[in-house]
Amino acid sequence: MSALSARVPLANSQERYLQLRINERRALEEYLAQLRAKFGGHIQHVILYGSRARLSGDQESDLDVLIVIDRDDQQLANEVADEAFGPSLQHGVVISPLVWSAEHFQAHRRFGLLIYRNIEKDGIELWSDKTKLPLSSIG
């Protein structure tokens, strides 16, 4: 069990995820599918955070997504972030990826930095390397 799922019960996360608009879920799921196909072995976590994860955003709010990759590689990070463009455009939402290496993620955890605490508190883990299975909700 990840540190995030230990703090936020899965049922609560899944319920919040299902309350996203259908185009938001479709954009996220398409993005996850592209990440899995192109970078699956390098992705450790994908976490929705921010106002949409808290269900407090409005129609203009972006989808803040943290992607944790297995190494500190700027080219890989850029490629992972760039994959958000197509699903964003196709589904009329803005996916705002934040790509961290696992080491960077652990440093934020270790020092209890504010962004990590907010992600831990409100984040919805869409994908963990433990399961490699994103949440699926499109009916």
Segment roles from a protein language model:
Residues 2-45, 53-59, 69-139:
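Catalytic core of pol beta-like nucleotidyltransferases
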Residues 63-67:
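Short beta-strand->loop micro-motif that forms the acidic, two-metal-ion catalytic signature
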